[in-house]
Amino acid sequence: MNGLGMQKFEHPLNERTRIYLRIESLLRKLGHSADLTQPYEYQVFFSSLFHMLDILEQVQVKADLGKDLEKLRLQYRAWMNIEGVDQSALLSVLEQISQVHQNLMQTTRPGHSLKEDRFLSALKQRFFIPGGDCCFDLPALHHWLHLPLDVRCRNTHNWMSQLLSLSDALSLWLRLTRETARYTPQIARNGFMQSEMENSNLLRLEIPIDQGVYPMISGHKSRFALRFMSFETNKNCEKDIEFTLAVC
């Protein structure tokens, strides 16, 4: 490995996985900013929370994720009593899937209680106005920011807890999906590669940073193409690029 290390990219091969990755990114930002240890972390927290609520309003994430978890459960059940398969580990995974699926299905629509929160609703209406978090635009926010830190942190963690069943279910589905494939060495001749596969959800790439390139990817569940671009010129890279790829 080179001194600069590797850069990792993921690309969804269907719309559901695209939404799941966006939600995962927002959940990660919420988790990193919820303790409000830095002066402007509240901006990261609220912008991530409101983007999350917009996604949950537009997409039936609970129903889609429930179906995908059930599909995973059937796939794993097919391995039961197969010689050479660690049955203890398999049963553990099946129990995890059943538990997060049950918790997800028993909750109301994710984000519904947050949408009904009067403080959050008033804040969301004006939060994305450029520079709109001034005290004259959002006096309620200005008041909230002057509350004791422990009070504000209780608020942020309580709001996050409303998304816990979604977070647990999504994290498990993405983890198991990522674990379906190992990275294998690849070479993109003249910076280009295309391939076919069967019913895949996700591409994962590791690229040496000192190659000075980033990938532009298009694809769906049965075919993909990627073109490496030069970061310096923002044009097609014409050299061979070595990288590793996992098709999940």
Curated annotation (Swiss-Prot):
UniProt keyword annotations, A-Z: Cell cycle, Cell division, Cytoplasm, Septation
SUPFAM superfamilies, alphabetized: YacF-like
Main location group: cytoplasm
Subcellular location: Cytoplasm
NCBIfam families, per the entry: PRK05287.1-3 (NF003655)
GO process terms (BP): division septum assembly; FtsZ-dependent cytokinesis
Function recorded in the entry: Cell division factor that enhances FtsZ-ring assembly. Directly interacts with FtsZ and promotes bundling of FtsZ protofilaments, with a reduction in FtsZ GTPase activity.
Cellular component GO terms held in the UniProt record: cell division site; cytoplasm
Official protein name in the record: Cell division protein ZapD
Pfam family, one: ZapD
InterPro entries xref list: ZapD (IPR009777), ZapD_C (IPR027462), ZapD_sf (IPR036268)
Subunit structure: Interacts with FtsZ.
Protein family (similarity comment): Belongs to the ZapD family.
Highest classification ranks of the organism: Bacteria, Pseudomonadati, Pseudomonadota, Gammaproteobacteria, Vibrionales
Gene source species: Aliivibrio salmonicida (strain LFI1238) (Vibrio salmonicida (strain LFI1238))
HAMAP family in the cross-refs: ZapD (MF_01092)
Keyword Cell division: yes
